[in-house]
């Protein structure tokens, strides 16, 4: 039987966001086996409270090679931690996070993985069963829209995968909610190692402008077999707030008027005060749903034995 998990890489500065996401996942999502929250090893104690029946906090070291190790926090650069090794130059925490996502998608036991940014919060029910095999996995496809950084990431992905520069259109495959297939992720890793002649993690550590979603999308787009197991879509299932500091009324109105396919919202770029207001709105929503649920089973609806 097909299975699916949720995967969220998260850092210590995102503990509050993790709590908000976990609460929304528990309330609104169904048809997943486990929620894997991946954290740096020395942050395990901070996230231990999130362990549960359907959620496990995973130390990053379980997914990374032993030769890649975090530097002491005192050596952070511009607020970002770095990882070092004797094989490559130091790599940033954001670079390592991209590697962790690929490692999780290939190593975790479930057949498919729904990879979530830590700033994603669900506000509606989301049945994940349509994402299971044998149905094709959705692959978010959007235009690059002339982004220099994304164009560089496209070139890096093509090089790592051994693709010609003219073989792919100028499209992006990124999204705040991504669905990856384990078999596809493993095949992508094999391709990278075959093309580069090195272990895939080392190859990615030696590369610049690496983007995991671009790598995955380029690989799927170029593979007849794996392309057939995916279906392109423009739906991200996630809305963004128009302002950086919306008030409570604006947040309520935005969620209330969301499209039917929008089940989550992104807190990226939101002011801390607005994130607190969003949390309050979702808590009030949960209380209202709890009151409505018992009322749905009225005495008149009960058939006497």
Which functions belong to the PLM regions below?
Residues 16, 42-48:
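Short, charged/polar "capping" segments at the starts of alpha-helices
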Residues 1-23:
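N-proximal low-complexity "stem/linker" segments adjacent to membrane-targeting elements
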Residues 36-40:
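Short internal beta-strands
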Residues 193-305:
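A glycosyltransferase accessory/donor-loop signature
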Residues 126-202:
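Conserved catalytic core of nucleotide-sugar-dependent glycosyltransferases
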Residues 46-106:
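Active-site-proximal specificity loops/subdomain of glycosyltransferases
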Residues 23-32:
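Short, acidic, metal-binding catalytic loop of nucleotide-sugar glycosyltransferases
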Residues 100-139:
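GT-A fold catalytic core of metal-dependent nucleotide-sugar glycosyltransferases
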């Amino acid at each position: 039987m097909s299975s699916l998990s949720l995967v969220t890489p998260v850092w210590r500065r995102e503990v509050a966001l993790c709590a908000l996401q976990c609460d929304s996942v528990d309330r609104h999502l169904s048809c997943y086996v486990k929620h894997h929250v991946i954290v740096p090893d020395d942050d395990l104690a901070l996230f231990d409270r999130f362990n549960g029946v359907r959620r496990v906090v995973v130390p990053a070291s379980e997914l990374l090679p032993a030769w890649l190790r975090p530097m002491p926090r005192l050596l952070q650069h511009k607020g970002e931690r770095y990882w070092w090794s004797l094989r490559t130059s130091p790599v940033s925490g954001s670079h390592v996070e991209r590697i962790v996502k690929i490692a999780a998608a290939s190593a975790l036991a479930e057949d498919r993985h729904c990879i979530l940014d830590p700033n994603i919060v669900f506000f509606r029910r989301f049945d994940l069963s349509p994402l299971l095999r044998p149905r094709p996995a959705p692959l978010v496809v959007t235009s690059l829209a002339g982004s220099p950084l994304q164009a560089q990431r496209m070139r890096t992905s093509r090089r790592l995968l051994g693709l010609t520069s003219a073989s792919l259109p100028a499209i992006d495959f990124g999204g705040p909610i991504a669905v990856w297939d384990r078999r596809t992720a493993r095949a992508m890793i094999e391709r990278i190692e075959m093309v580069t002649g090195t272990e895939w993690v080392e190859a990615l550590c030696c590369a610049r402008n690496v983007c995991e979603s671009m790598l995955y999308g380029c690989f799927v787009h170029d593979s007849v077999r794996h392309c057939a197991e995916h279906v392109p879509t423009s739906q991200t299932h996630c809305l963004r707030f128009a302002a950086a500091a919306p008030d409570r009324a604006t947040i309520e109105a935005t969620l209330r008027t969301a499209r039917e396919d929008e089940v989550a919202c992104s807190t990226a770029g939101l002011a801390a005060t607005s994130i607190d207001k969003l949390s309050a709105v979702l808590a009030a929503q949960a209380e209202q749903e709890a009151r409505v649920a018992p009322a749905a089973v009225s005495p008149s609806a009960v058939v006497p034995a």
